[in-house]
């Protein structure tokens, strides 16, 4: 479900009139009967001002589609910002942008795709923003039949508009290269670079047609658990882990390696309600530990 959708021209006007955050808030209440927290409202006002700067270019068609807060089906996750249109050869393109208000980030060694940053009142391990954008795009593509039938190409990226890159840049260290290649990271002072990234894919407006295709796409049936586990043990990727799932997975892997090294037993209890992805974490761990010879 898309919370807010409009043309690029609609979005620019709403930001100019200081109404965009209110429009999103009202739509969320209308569609989901949920009140918006003040910090979330402020984050929209802040981040969307930066997206205004990025999109305020005549080379990006005024009738391109803009979506804000797209709820990924079968998950509780939301894509922050989407812009849609056609490329030079009329190929359908959708740019997915993960917006972050972080101003400091630390690399996390020894755990795939994790970084440390201040969030939720403390410094925590979270997924790298490039991994987050890439995994959201992969999830949408895997489960939305319109994406595959319409040959819609997804272009994920992350925009950390409060964060200034350093030299060497922590978010672009060797351990993150694979994810940054698939989903580039743009930081404070790089609005023009993000604009160029969008302009490469969106040259002709789609009048929101691609947003409609995404929002109305038929959801593919869930994969067979038995077949998926067999495929994963053979080295194939079947279930993509999102956000906290990836963090928990990496923490358990770290603990498993510690147990192998010091020969001590440890128990990890993963709590979560229905649909939070405990099974996804478990089968990814089963496949990984089996392939690494760590599963007894």
Residue ranges and their predicted role:
Residues 1-215:
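Accessory nucleic-acid engagement/destabilization modules that flank
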Residues 237-266:
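N-terminal pre-P-loop "Q-motif" helix
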Residues 274:
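The conserved Walker
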